[in-house]
């Protein structure tokens, strides 16, 4: 069944609450959103969220509004100004495009919306073309850019890669651009799987070097005997990461590595402790805008 219309939710927040709101949206599985600076009040930002009608009945929309209010209340910001409107699929397809532009990530990559021409000054970059459809995911979010910046340090020639929580497929595409021979992508949202496959085909013309799986990682591991990976990319919420660290370790070959992102600064120490307990050696820790990326290795 296809999406035929969208709910658009708009509300304002103080600019310093941006990170916690993004974290909450990610926790709730919402990836189609944007934040807009207000010209008349630069201390505030407008949050725009797009929700496909098939996945968001009235009961879930009410719960979402309540969850957002709770986060704002805890941070001493109160608002009742939640605006809901219904937009048609065609209008949605154009409404969020104005928030997109070419996005430089790290030293080598440029993320380019597929409807834009490549600027001349970026001709020397590795270009990842993205058409997000219903699954947003660009290099602009700190969790993604941290992961991409770490990924470009690796020599991936002929390596076997697993991408957990693929979203729009940007990490899977980057891994293939950096030389991976085969990329395996997992997401529990069929919209994300469709987006990953579509964007991979947009960049490489076919899906010969991509294998996708729909479902939960911990269930798919045993069902499909996923193992012997050289590198695993895991850009998902820390609360989910905590429960799958042993399975991730089992999927790695000896000396294989894993890049974790989606971790808040406040969650870093707990994640590192769990990684150490699973005999995963910490090789690198980086941070950006309150988010942390951890690279660990299976030594024995």
Swiss-Prot record:
It is an enzyme of class 2 (transferase). The keyword Cytoplasm applies. Its EC number is 2.1.1.-. Signal peptide: none annotated. SUPFAM superfamilies: S-adenosyl-L-methionine-dependent methyltransferases. GO terms for cellular component: cytoplasm. The keyword Lipoprotein does not apply. Pfam families: PrmA (PF06325). GO terms for biological process: methylation. Keywords: Cytoplasm, Methyltransferase, S-adenosyl-L-methionine, Transferase. It catalyses: L-lysyl-[protein] + 3 S-adenosyl-L-methionine = N(6),N(6),N(6)-trimethyl-L-lysyl-[protein] + 3 S-adenosyl-L-homocysteine + 3 H(+). S-adenosyl-L-methionine binds at residues 144, 165, 187, 235. It is found in: Cytoplasm. GO terms for molecular function: protein-lysine N-methyltransferase activity. Belongs to the methyltransferase superfamily. PrmA family. PANTHER family: ELECTRON TRANSFER FLAVOPROTEIN BETA SUBUNIT LYSINE METHYLTRANSFERASE. Methylates ribosomal protein L11. This is Ribosomal protein L11 methyltransferase. It comes from Prochlorococcus marinus (strain MIT 9515). The gene is prmA.
């Amino acid at each position: 069944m296809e999406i035929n219309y969208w709910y658009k939710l708009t509300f304002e927040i103080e600019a310093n609450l941006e990170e916690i709101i993004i974290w909450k949206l990610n926790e709730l599985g919402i990836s189609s959103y944007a934040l807009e600076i207000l010209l008349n009040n630069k201390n505030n930002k407008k949050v725009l969220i797009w929700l496909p009608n098939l996945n968001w009945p009235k009961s879930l929309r009410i719960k979402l509004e309540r969850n957002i209010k709770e986060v704002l209340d805890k941070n001493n910001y109160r608002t009742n100004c939640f605006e809901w409107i219904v937009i048609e699929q065609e209008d949605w397809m154009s409404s969020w495009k104005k928030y997109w532009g070419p996005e430089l990530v790290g030293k080598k990559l440029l993320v380019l919306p597929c409807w834009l021409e490549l600027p001349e000054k970026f001709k020397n970059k590795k270009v990842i073309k993205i058409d997000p459809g219903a699954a947003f995911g660009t290099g602009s979010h700190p969790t993604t850019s941290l992961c991409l910046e770490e990924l470009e340090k690796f020599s991936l020639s002929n390596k076997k890669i697993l991408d957990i929580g693929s979203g729009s497929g940007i990490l899977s595409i980057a891994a293939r651009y950096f030389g991976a021979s085969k990329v395996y992508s997992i997401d529990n949202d069929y919209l994300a799987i469709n987006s990953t496959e579509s964007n991979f085909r947009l960049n490489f013309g076919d899906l010969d070097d991509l294998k996708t799986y729909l479902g939960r990682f911990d269930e798919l591991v045993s069902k499909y005997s996923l193992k012997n990976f050289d590198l695993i990319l895991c850009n998902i919420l820390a609360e989910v990461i905590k429960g799958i660290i042993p399975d991730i370790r089992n999927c790695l070959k000896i000396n294989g590595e894993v890049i974790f992102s989606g971790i808040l600064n406040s969650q870093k120490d707990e994640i590192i402790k769990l990684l150490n307990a699973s005999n995963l050696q910490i090789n690198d820790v980086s941070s950006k805008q309150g988010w942390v990326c951890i690279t660990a290795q299976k030594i024995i």
